[in-house]
């Protein structure tokens, strides 16, 4: 595609398979909503074997494809027909085509970093993504209906990108077709990933041959999709010292040459692309494209990490939480449907050893009886949701010094007892889904704070912000703080004017923590137009009881409120 004002030049290459000498009449017609926009035709004398033929089309007043949340996704159909000299049909193919311009710019204030800021059709796009895993271990078991539901849920969570992780496999045509239609950008990794043995990309000649064959087959199939944003050499690939691999690596250089030859899109050497592989506050200025952590850092430490982060792109991180009770009842026998941990219960360990949240949940909410499994799940999932929401909003408050967040992970390919997923194997959403959905709203009020668990009588420092990916907003923000019993402790209403695709930070404020099970701060954003409903963000802070823990009934009530 090449743009000139409001028109576009589309060029393509047809690959023809001839079985014998014959004259073929070829045509290509671009159609939009049933009406032909432009066409091309030619005749060619086929010979046995493979031939290629270039064609080009001029599209006046082209309609641009936009990522989700930033406009419509108009799709054209390219009809390619081959007929013999007697006008009998030899072959016919129909391709879906979308037109958009893509540029990659440096993140604000970044130096010596790869360009991670995505600009589509002249507008900077903050990446709000999730890491997508195959919903089944075998691709043959994945139906289009399953993908429609899964990707529809991702779109409803206000996501505009999926990262197809290098430890998975390249998806079916259905996957990319649905992303085209929904406006979900695709970060496509080649099929390489870190392992427990070695993260250095293989240089074995036979492996490199297979890698090249796979890439040569995949790139021409994927490159026609407007949703395809970029390629990556793979997941968490490094050199021998543990530094993220770059294009000097023989393996990665091979893939780069193939992308440059077969497509014109951006390619990252790997993800994380460094120079740090993992987010590290001790090495500021080196957290460009980073991964991790995948755990809730603690009732204070988690907030310190994300308040001080200087990541340019946070392409993989998460927080773990227990599976839904309905899922556990399908995979565990009755004797294992009890509160336990993965040190003591090998069945639980087999279904999620790395994601044991027992110690974390008990340290925040106190002890649980064996029969308190439902409450335990709700408290575990609440911390997962809270931790994710804070990380996403903290990164987004720094847009475009930070250019995107990609949650690990959206779904799971098999059922587990605990994990970092937002939707379980059976298609039921965890609490974290709803918190991510709110954090990714195009326009949403947000709150900066220092910790989750407080002593009564302490003073907490807070700062509200308005995060805006959309058009200019004019209205007011109402800040209210209430005790768990409903007593109004603080109220302030401010007129706000938020520029298009920019954030607005408001004046900090302080509140004395009440002698109550919890403090709730409501941020209510109201437009000057009475037509739009208010946008509300709710933040709950726990207070320590006599034993130093939070009252778990507060978390249980919040879980039940969101999951209704």
Regions flagged by a language model, labelled:
Residues 195-200, 436:
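Short, charged, surface-exposed secondary-structure boundary motifs
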Residues 105, 134-137, 169-172, 195-196, ...:
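Flexible loop/turn segments at secondary-structure boundaries
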Residues 1-163, 397-398, 402, 428, ...:
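Secreted/periplasmic carbohydrate-active enzymes, especially glycoside hydrolases
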Residues 121, 128, 165, 187-189, ...:
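Generic beta-strand/beta-sheet core signal
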